[in-house]
C-alpha cells in the first residue's frame, strides 16, 4: 500500500526589509474558502540537504519526495539556533534566540508563553500535540547545564566518548525508535477517532526524536558518547556508493572554536574511512525511518479523505554533522548542522515548487497565523512563508534576504552568530574582536572549507554591519556570560560544599577528582573575573 501511494545575494541587497520595518507586512492574511487543517511534523537532527539533489541520492525518502512533488520545498531553510530547546523556542515563539533568552537546552520559554497554537485555538482551531516538544525551560541533564555554564573555564575541556554505530541485524525490524512510533500511532489514532469527526479545522503537531543519535549505554571509554542505531531494514535504504566522505581541514588549520568543538566531541583523533562511512550510513538509515513516520501521517490523512483539506508541514529543529568538519551532533553553523528541511503541501500551496530564498524556523509562527487568518503580530522575528509558496500572492519579496542563527550552549566556547544571505555565510563570535570571524561563499565553496573573511574585507565589513543592525551581538555575548555565572553560582550554592564531588561524576568531568583543588580554584577565578566574552 505504501508503494502504491508513493507512486501515484549580493551584499547591497541586504538593505530591506528589517524586522518590524514600517510598511512591510509579514503575511497576506489570506482567507481560504474553507479553513484548512494543519499538520506540523518536526523531527530532530535532520540534515535539510537530504531533501534535494545531490543529497537526496544517498537515501530513499519516499514521503519527503511525495511532499516535494505535491508541494513546495524551501531549499535554504535554517534553524535559528542549532540545538534542540533554543531552536524549538524560536519556532514556537516566532522570536530570535536572543529575544527569548533561550541560551541552552535548559533555558527555554515560560510554560505559559503564548504560542502560535494558542492563537490558532482562539481562532477556532481544535489543537493536539504528540511527541517531543522541548521548547520550555527545565529539561535536560545537569551535565548539559554545567558544561554550558562553564564553557569559559579552559580546564573543563573534556572529551565525550567517540561516536559509535550499532546495527540490529534483522531485515524485518522496522520499528527501531519505539517511542517515536508510539507517538506516531497516537497521532494517527487521534486523526481517525477525533479529528475526522470535527466540524472545525484542526492543527496537529507531532514531534519526533529521530534521527537524533541515541545515548550510548556504555560506562567505559565511550561513556557519554552517542550511537547511530538502526536495523538492516533501514540500512538497505541507503546507497553506500553515494555516501560522500567529507573533507577535513588539518587540525592546525581549524578555526579555534571548531577545534574546541571537535575536541569535546572526541573527534580530533584518527578515524578510518570505514568508520566515517558507517556513521554517515547509519545516520541516513535513521532518516529513512523518520520519513516512514511522516508517511504514516500522510497515509492516514489520505485514507480519511483529509489530505486535500490539510496543509502538511515537515521540518526539523536542526541538522546533524555526521562527521563533517570533524564533528558529529549539531552546535555549529556549518550546513550539515544549521540547514533544515522545510516542505509544505496542501490547499493553496503550489506543487513541485522549489524556493531558493533563505528562510528560518521563526517563520513558522507567522505562517500558522496566516493560515488561520489571525492578525499577524508586529513584534515577530519571522515572516509568513505563504507568499513564497503560493501563486495566489502577488507580492513575493516580503521576506528579507537574510536569516539569523545564534548559539550559546555546550560544546562551543564562544557565542556564535550566523548571517546567511543568498550567496554568503558570515559567522561572528563572542565580542566581534577576540575571535576571528568566518566568511564562506557557498556558491563556490559548498563544503565550507575556505574562510575568505580576510580576502574580502569589504564583504566582511558590510555583513558585520548588517549583523550588528539586527543584533548587538557583543552585548548579547556579555549577557550570556553573566547568565552562565549566575546560574552556576545558584547551582553551586544549592549543592553546598559537596559540589566538587557532584561535578566529578557529571558526564564531561570524569577526571575532576584528580586535581579537585586546582579545578575549584579555577572556578573561583572565573567567577571573579569581569563579565566579558572570553578571548580565544
Predicted regions and their residues:
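Cleavable N-terminal signal peptides of Sec/SRP-targeted secreted and luminal proteins
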Residues: 1-15
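A structural signal for well-ordered alpha-helical segments within the folded catalytic domains
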Residues: 36-37, 58-62, 111-118, 178-188, ...
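Catalytic-site neighborhoods of secreted/periplasmic enzymes
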Residues: 90-186, 190-196, 217-219, 223-229
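C-terminal, low-complexity/hydrophilic appendages and adjacent surface loops
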Residues: 135, 222, 335-337, 405-454, ...
